[in-house]
Design a protein with these regions (language model features):
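A short beta-strand element within the Helicase C-terminal
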Residues: 384-395, 421-424
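Conserved interdomain hinge at the start of the Helicase C-terminal
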Residues: 268-301
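Inter-lobe coupling linker of SF2 helicases/translocases
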Residues: 2-210, 436-437
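Conserved helicase ATPase core of P-loop NTP-dependent helicases/translocases
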Residues: 332-375
Length: 437
């Protein structure tokens, strides 16, 4: 279906045609109906093309036509263009957080996270009533982003941070721990600012915007509008009920310190999810689903997790199987275990999927090959990586469309693989608990 929402003016204005798109399609349909009644000798593609007018071809040149897997299988000669690989039943894995005895689990972490107020992200809630008009004038009447008051923006950041914490917990202990430490550092520096003001009341201090946008991975952040306003907001501590704010910050600090302490013992050797990933990789390499194919893609939503996986997985596959690994991310520089190989996106993907990327043309003298690719969603769209037959979602993206897009990197017509496999890692919680998360 064409995405012009029933309003043909939306697309007519963008097309270089003499008639509306509705008229063009009606005319094309009449031509087709006439052509389809001709005898077989005259009912040729050449005759049909001659009957269609210029406007119809202008439309075809101006739009992208999406075809589903079923549509292609039904209407196209797959013997000529190739077939789709057979999708094996997806594998779902739910490893525990750790195999350490009496260690914290997902549900216990969730309960502690529910204790966080995250008021570090809502300083405007503590502005004294007598000072509210001052900040309403400064920020809420700002015309740059009508509808986003500073208080609303802060509340949005607080909620996003809470969701971000939970998704990072699900992604990896390492990523979760990093985020806890970053928020703790922010809280401690703010408490220090308050204490400094409290002890030296003659010193005029201002709090600039404390939201840390970098905490969200750029390839995942779809809430740019939320962060576009208020970057230079300043609230004088003297205009706040800073004692109440400090009390709230201290409570969050104590919870964060407890969480950091409890997850700190979960090092890679005790990270059950990572160890399960090693098992999955080992099984795939020792028992390939397509003869001789060792290639694996591991997707994660977070650059921190991608780096953690690269540090551990690359060593594992190099030591055990003498294979090369690479990592690509939209927010950090790529990495690879291949000596002297440029780790830019195009080079890495060409070495990972040499057939689909025509490596023999681009790098004819290079025999380098990468068998394991760790990636964020910077490559979840638009990349043909059909040399690979095995895709692992190390975490589940909040947007289900991304999961489909990820698998689409290897589920492609003309694939040399007979079978393809999807593996999903889920948090070790019940369905009801997961919905709550």
């Amino acid at each position: 279906a064409l995405a012009y929402e029933g309003n043909t003016d939306l697309i007519d204005d963008k097309l270089n045609t003499t008639r509306s798109i509705d008229d063009i399609f009606k005319s094309a349909q009449r031509v087709f109906n006439t052509w389809s009644k001709w005898n077989p000798a005259d009912r040729t593609t050449e005759n049909l093309l001659r009957m269609l007018d210029f406007d119809f071809f202008e439309v075809l040149d101006s739009v992208t036509i999406a075809r589903s897997r079923k549509h292609i299988q039904k209407y196209y000669d797959t013997a000529e263009i190739g077939t789709f690989p057979t999708r094996l039943k997806p594998i779902s894995l739910r490893p525990p957080l750790t195999n350490l005895k009496q260690a914290i689990n997902y549900n216990e972490i969730f309960e502690l996270l529910m204790l966080l107020s995250l008021t570090i992200y809502t300083p405007s809630h503590f502005i004294l009533p007598s000072k509210m008009d001052k900040y309403a004038e400064l920020y809420e009447d700002n015309k740059v982003n009508i509808g986003f008051t500073q208080a609303n923006r802060e509340q949005g950041i607080r909620r996003l941070t809470a969701i971000n914490l939970m998704k990072r917990m699900e992604s990896s202990v390492y990523s979760f721990n990093l985020t806890l430490k970053r928020i703790l550092e922010l809280i401690e520096s703010t408490i220090h600012s308050i204490d400094t003001y409290d002890k030296k009341s003659s010193v005029k201090l201002e709090l600039t915007d404390i939201s840390n946008v970098d905490e969200f991975d750029s390839e995942d952040q779809n809430d740019e509008e939320l962060f576009a306003f208020g970057k230079k907001v300043k609230i004088e501590i003297g205009d706040m009920d800073y004692k109440s704010w400090r009390d709230s910050l201290v409570k969050d600090r104590d919870v964060l310190e407890l969480l950091i302490l409890m997850v700190g013992d979960i090092t890679p050797e005790y990270d059950s999810k990572l160890q399960e990933l090693f098992r999955v990789i080992k099984n795939k390499l020792e028992h390939p689903i397509n003869e001789g194919n060792k290639k694996i893609i591991i997707f994660t939503a977070f650059a921190d997790t991608a780096g953690y996986l690269y540090d551990n997985v690359s060593k594992f596959v190099k030591d055990k199987f003498h294979l090369n690994t690479a990592m690509v991310s939209g927010s950090v520089e790529g990495r690879t275990t291949v000596p002297k190989l440029h780790s830019d996106l195009n080079t890495v993907l060409t070495c990972f999927s040499p057939i689909s990327k025509d490596k023999y043309l681009l790098m004819p003298d290079d025999k380098t090959e990468i068998d394991l690719l760790i990636a964020t969603d910077c490559i979840s769209e638009g990349q043909n990586l059909q040399d690979c037959d095995y895709l692992i979602n190390y975490d589940i993206h909040w947007n289900p469309v991304r999961i489909i897009q990820r698998f689409g990197r290897i589920d492609r017509i003309g694939s040399k693989n007979t079978y393809i496999q999807l593996v999903n890692f889920w948090a070790d919680v019940t369905l009801d608990d997961y919905i709550d998360l």
